[in-house]
């Protein structure tokens, strides 16, 4: 996936050439059938298949600490086994309130059980003491400044959607920094992918996806109007508000490169 500055509201997971053209309910990236960090070169055809690989990954006993003050805590959600070994699921909180990095630790998966918000929604433009904003994000309240949270993800980290309704929302005034490498891509995928239930014919729709909510101009308003330069829009299908739009076409929601997004595109709601 090419390095891009990501503007407005982008849903990552369609195609690397159409990042801005994806809707929140139509993203899909089938990917592989099992979680493999280092993708091997295509082998020459052989008359007989090789033996099934021996699982090499073992789950650690505990989840890592992300912050010294305990402000962002992971929940130990048990283990899961698949063709590549056993993993411990370290579940992200529903609201990430402080900048953190998810480190790569052998046998650790970072889980999303439902919607995970990166920071609080800061509104159409950055709030201030003179112009506070009542954030639409659950658990945030009134803001007098952007929360400025950055979720950083180390190369080789695997994140999973534990349910169909699981998705990552990077709210206005916050960022994601997910920069993998060619040999250690960052993988967002479904729990079934890790468990080895998926096949070559498995389609997307097993979890929601990754949504970047920005302050670029939009024209399909359901809040405000284009004429008054107050146009905003709600993310389709979100149970609770996930709003995007503003008046800053230079807005930067972070950086993503060498990222795989597999089996995403679950329909969050029928409307």
Label each region the model flagged.
Residues 1-10:
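Bacterial N-terminal signal peptides that target proteins for export
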Residues 18-21:
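C-terminal motif of bacterial Sec signal peptides marking the signal peptidase cleavage site
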Residues 23-271:
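Beta-strand/loop edge motif enriched in small/polar residues
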